[in-house]
A protein has these predicted regions:
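A catalytic-pocket lid/entrance helix-loop region that shapes and gates access to the active site
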Residues: 89-123
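Conserved loop-alpha-helix segment in the C-terminal half of the alpha/beta-hydrolase fold
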Residues: 186-227
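Conserved catalytic-core motifs of eukaryotic protein kinase domains, centered on the activation segment
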Residues: 6-8, 30-36, 97-100, 204-205
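Conserved HGGG/HGGXW glycine-rich cap/lid loop of the alpha/beta-hydrolase fold
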Residues: 1-31
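Conserved hydrolase catalytic core segment
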Residues: 57-102
C-alpha cells in the first residue's frame, strides 16, 4: 500500500507551500488499529481532524491520492469552511454499492475477517524482491522503490510488509450511489480532480467516474497522462503545475 512517501516527488515541486504528508492508520509508520476497530474511510476523519487541530491549522487545502482521495472528500466535508481547496489525485469515493448488493458486501467482509487469523505478513529477502513483487501488481520500479522505506520493516527472516492487512479487506458497509452523490453535491470548496488515463478507472469506468465527480459544484476535472502513480513518476511535474495554478 501507499504511504506518506507517495508525496515525496511532488513535495519539492510544491515548495512554495507547507506540505504535510501523514501515514494514515495502518500504513507506513503509523500504528495498526485495535482488533475490534475497522478501516472504513470515515474512521480516519476524527484522527485527521485531531491532527489539524493539534497543529493549529485554521485553514488548509486538502490533497489526497487513491484511498486517501476518498478520505479527503469526507475530510473536506467535515472541515467545511476551513478547507480552502480540495485536490484529488486519481481517486474519489469508493465504488458505490446498491441496496440489493449490501448483504453480499457484508458477507465478504465477514469472510475476510475470518481469514485474518491465518494471515502472515509477506517477507522479502531484500528491497529488490519487494520491488519485483510490486511491479507485478502494476507499480513502476520507481514508485515501488520510493515507497519501500516506509512499507517494510526488517526482521530476523527478512523485510516484512508493515501495513495492516485489514486495509485490503472488504468494508462491511459501503455508501450507496445516492449517498456518494449527496457528499459530492455538499462539497462547498473549489475542487481539482486529476484522473490518470491509465489509472484506477479506465475506459468506460473513467467516463462514469467523471460523470459522478461532475456532481461537485465547483470542480475543475481533468485527465492526465500516466498511471495511477503518475504523481510519483513522469507525470509529477505536470501534476504539480496543475496544483500550483489551481491553488494560486
Amino acid at each position: 500500500l501507499d504511504n506518506a512517501l507517495s508525496f515525496s516527488v511532488l513535495a519539492p515541486l510544491l515548495d512554495r507551500y507547507r506540505l504535510i504528508a501523514v501515514d494514515l492508520s495502518g500504513q507506513g509508520f503509523s500504528d495498526h488499529r485495535s482488533p475490534d476497530a475497522t478501516y472504513h474511510i470515515w474512521d480516519d476523519i476524527p484522527q485527521l481532524l485531531a491532527v489539524i487541530d493539534e497543529m493549529r491549522l485554521d485553514r488548509l487545502a486538502v490533497l489526497g491520492h487513491s484511498r486517501g482521495a476518498a478520505i479527503a472528500v469526507l475530510l473536506a466535508a467535515a472541515l467545511e469552511d476551513r478547507c480552502s481547496q480540495l485536490v484529488l489525485l486519481d481517486g474519489m469515493l469508493p465504488r458505490a454499492v446498491a441496496d440489493e448488493e449490501a448483504p453480499a458486501q457484508f458477507l465478504q467482509a465477514q469472510r475476510d475477517h475470518q481469514r485474518l487469523a491465518k494471515h502472515r505478513p509477506r517477507v522479502f529477502a531484500d528491497v529488490d524482491e519487494f520491488v519485483k513483487a510490486r511491479v507485478r501488481l502494476g507499480f513502476s520500479d520507481q514508485s515501488a522503490r520510493i515507497l519501500a522505506p516506509r512499507a517494510l520493516r526488517r526482521g530476523a527472516s527478512g523485510l516484512a510488509l508493515v501495513h495492516d492487512p485489514r486495509l485490503n479487506h472488504a468494508s462491511a458497509v459501503k455508501m450507496s450511489p445516492a449517498m456518494c452523490a449527496a457528499f459530492y453535491a455538499a462539497l462547498n470548496t473549489p475542487t481539482l480532480t486529476l484522473m490518470a488515463e491509465q489509472g484506477l478507472r479506465q475506459q468506460g469506468e473513467l467516463e462514469s467516474a467523471i460523470q459522478a465527480l461532475s456532481g461537485i459544484p465547483d470542480c475543475d476535472l481533468r485527465t492526465v497522462p500516466g498511471s495511477h502513480h503518475a504523481h510519483m513518476e513522469e507525470g509529477a511535474e505536470a501534476i504539480a503545475g496543475h496544483i500550483v495554478n489551481f491553488i494560486a
